[in-house]
């Protein structure tokens, strides 16, 4: 039996196949051998969105769009229309595939819109539009495929043939760019400018919806009412991707909200949960978003599709992971460590140079005029100049700065913001928070193209650059005086000095000693603020790390969460000039645009401390990882940290890092295990103050809580260890600092090396690197915001542990080896074996080196802090005696030859007879204790 068109469309509604004949469209032709993926839209297209009706280029030129009607659904609408037929249309565009569901009347509406478009274009003044519309005019002269005026949607007869007719109709239209890119067609196909960007993942779900205002779960955005007067409905274009959704204003194309999926994600459909007919409710930790669809069928379909999309590559963010982190462990991640700022800054400079799309930076302090490679002979490696050059190339630079309380801190983030924002429109800087707060954004992060991420303890700021030499002086070319190469007070302080013959490593404000004097006048960057002819600088020791791939995506997602959160809650950033940021999909994370050489593969997990004030959610995974790593350690712990304030009393100090260390040592003692704990701390807190008179109130406050953790009071580590094992605690734990020496003005000088690292190494297999100090501020989550990564080695190499052959992780072993080599001065100790950190011989060598160095420094410089000064009276008497370095410089120099490395014992008895906590009458004494802990 032959099926005719009359059989298919009994009311004369058949498709006229002769009208479907079209000339080929040369615009939609791929070159032979060309990959369609190469024609897809670049990621930077997200920053240049056009109004939806402005006919933006949605589809990739030359890449065909293929439609296939794969099935039908028949349902009862509940109205007088009766049974309706729904056509499922599967579309393919390059590697993108998606499905849309349409009624026959939707095809008819599309047909009418295209006919009107064709007629309008044919009536245009040809001369006026000759230049801009000649391709469109030629296409308008082509015939549009015909579509019946109506049809018997209730008939099920010959359904497959009817599907084929509609399929042919769409495919003929989609071969013509004139119709394919028209807004009526893109709305029909549910596509937009964000549909075909490979780094955003799959096509996802899109379409016109109405969304309800409100629903934010952040301070200042909660409406107390539930009546309709408390909210409004707005028409928006919704885009759902695999780990987030957004909606845009159709009239401008601007993204007006981004909602990241997280463990609070849930989709509900129906009036009971949405208070709206045909409503869809999408919950996350930050917002409850309510959408209104055109029918219950659409609401149910959208709810199902959104749920399925979230279960794709972005499903990792729908639950908490190990240590209650938002990000899971990422195996096979390429990571590289950096000890000191020189290597870290140089790698950051190389990464910035290779940026093609985005640069994200967040710092506690950022100095725009910092030089990333030194000594500088031009401005090529100056941070602000580099960012300007990349912005001019089209790279989008987004910077988040901590907005300090100006009376308490002199980092002048306002100057940093103004300086950077004036460089180029593609550089955007936001500061947070506005309200006076006790807490800070303390994290340090730089992400390039959401593919390579740097983090650790290093701000891109003054005083941080250093190398293994830990120089105390910087006088430039010895044949020239120091002030010949630095701006004088009468010159322009903002002007860059002539660098063509520069020999300085630290220019202007970069030459610093934060205990001698805190930074001032940061708007005069190249003007010295301490006398480098008489005052040594304070060396800065720090640790950083770079990660690639999915772990970098996780760090970028954290930055995006904070950026979008800040944009949402601060009115001044709601303008389009500060765009919402979008996370790239994990599905493309392995396509690395470049790598930082020298890395090793390991399993990497991103950790953080955040609160609702800082990022809109609460997390303390850094603390959890510290506690777990200490608890599960088998052989040793190596800790470098700027602060060590722990041992919970349930009131003043809450974190239990110190308690876990005590428990682990007691366990080793009970079981007769060989277990070592190495702790390195700065000999003095990094606050301005005269230590010869006891230091300022800030120094004393930090010393009080540090000694309370280490050795003073019933909660301290050593008090509890001594109670259990007496002096045997010395077999398990070493507490040290770092010091170095040099020469200035013909006299020997010495200064402590300021340890700013935030590092934990356990068993040569596990490493934690980040911005978090060991104190409540950094670890509780409810206070400062912090970032860290947990690295577990997967690539092993032979080593030793307590004299026994041991498989050590390459990342952890190489990092510890580097740290120990510099600390112990291995360059002057050729037979030094650093492989076994646990055996008695090495531990004894470590302790003896620290003791010998400390003794020599004290004899020569009478340096502070010292165990010889247990009271303020003893301190005054101690500093009144001239040092050997002053009395006999030549003899002092000969004695200094016996110094090995930089290791010295931490003076546990310094001012032990004094109360170091600021008294209530002092200005610092009025500050809540939580600020110091």
From Swiss-Prot:
SUPFAM superfamilies: PH domain-like, Phospholipase D/nuclease, PX domain
CDD domains: PH_PLD, PX_PLD2
InterPro entries assigned: PH-like_dom_sf (IPR011993), PH_domain (IPR001849), PLD-like_dom (IPR025202), PLipase_D/transphosphatidylase (IPR001736), PLipase_D_euk (IPR016555), PLipase_D_fam (IPR015679), PX_dom (IPR001683), PX_dom_sf (IPR036871)
Catalyzed chemical reaction(s): a 1,2-diacyl-sn-glycero-3-phosphocholine + H2O = a 1,2-diacyl-sn-glycero-3-phosphate + choline + H(+); 1,2-dihexadecanoyl-sn-glycero-3-phosphocholine + H2O = 1,2-dihexadecanoyl-sn-glycero-3-phosphate + choline + H(+)
Region ranges (Catalytic): 441-788
Enzyme type, top EC level: hydrolase
Gene field: Pld2
Pfam family, one: PLDc_2
Domain PX intervals: 65-195
Name the record gives this protein: Phospholipase D2
Regulation: Stimulated by phosphatidylinositol 4,5-bisphosphate and phosphatidylethanolamine. Inhibited by phosphatidylserine and by oleate. Is not responsive to ADP-ribosylation factor 1 (ARF1), nor to GTP-binding protein RhoA.
Keywords of this entry: Cell membrane, Hydrolase, Lipid degradation, Lipid metabolism, Lipoprotein, Membrane, Phosphoprotein, Repeat
Membrane topology: Lipid-anchor
Domain of life: Eukaryota
Species whose genome carries this gene: Rattus norvegicus
Location of Phosphotyrosine modifications: 11
Entry function: Function as phospholipase selective for phosphatidylcholine. May have a role in signal-induced cytoskeletal regulation and/or endocytosis.
Tissue: Expressed in brain, lung, heart, kidney, stomach, small intestine, colon, and testis, and at a much lower levels in thymus, liver and muscle.
Places the protein is found: Cell membrane
PTM comment, free text: Phosphorylated by FGR. Phosphorylated on Tyr-11; most likely by EGFR.
